[in-house]
From Swiss-Prot:
Pfam families per record: Homeodomain
UniProt organism field: Oryza sativa subsp. japonica (Rice)
Protein name: WUSCHEL-related homeobox 10
Taxonomy, superkingdom: Eukaryota
Family statement drawn from the similarity comment of this UniProt entry: Belongs to the WUS homeobox family.
Amino acid sequence: MDRTATASWEVMSRRGEQQQQLMMQAPASHNGGSGGGEPARSRWAPKPEQILILESIFNSGMVNPAKDETARIRRLLERFGAVRDANVFYWFQNRRSRSRRRARQLQQACGAALHQLPSAAAAAGAGGGGDYYHHHHQPSSSPFLMHGGGGGGVVTSTTAAPAVAASGHFLADEVDGGGDDDLFAISRQMGLMARHGGGDHHYSSYADSDATQLSYQPTGTIQVFINGVAYDVPSGGALDMAGTFGRDAMLVHSSGEVLPVDEHGVLINSLQMGECYYLVSKSI
């Protein structure tokens, strides 16, 4: 009798231990199931070249691209790194939100400035016209050179591009910090490079609102967009890429096609009227 009771007690003890182990393993297996599935996708971090292209497209007016346009943009961005259609979609969505927020901030700032107009006008009258002269008589930036164009073979921008600090590289090495909203910083630093007077000068691809406008070529020019900025280029003659932007630069059409150059670094085909191009570096 004692043996039977002892055996029953041992069986019950083992069952209790098994149930306790199962209860302890259940939460662990549940947590493991939730974390052992598809790993959490890391946030897409676009490269500077991808940001430049996205900003140029957004600034050209395409703020909400359709599905087919999103796919075209994604194929263009894939030349510089992995990207998905969803990444492009959400980038434009976030970019529109930032634009609306900035517009509200500017509207509030303008509303506050309305109350200060009388004092500002009085201060401007007392200060004279020196600032006005400085603003409207700044020296123009050097135009881009064209191949075989003679005296008129230049590319001029409809909006001036302010110069930034020159460096030994086509792309800027440093990007100024400016918070989450300052996404333009990388694009501003990735300036177009023009060679003039034996030195290398970097010009920002985005026009400053206070910069002076360069003059148009009177005749024989067409308008193209390079990095979101409108430029007037001679209708005849190909762009001297090596002489204008350096051997490390190349032009990419908005369709994703890289424009070919000859052994001298001159574009084989002329730029087309109204088309969009992006200036990027070959060393990426």
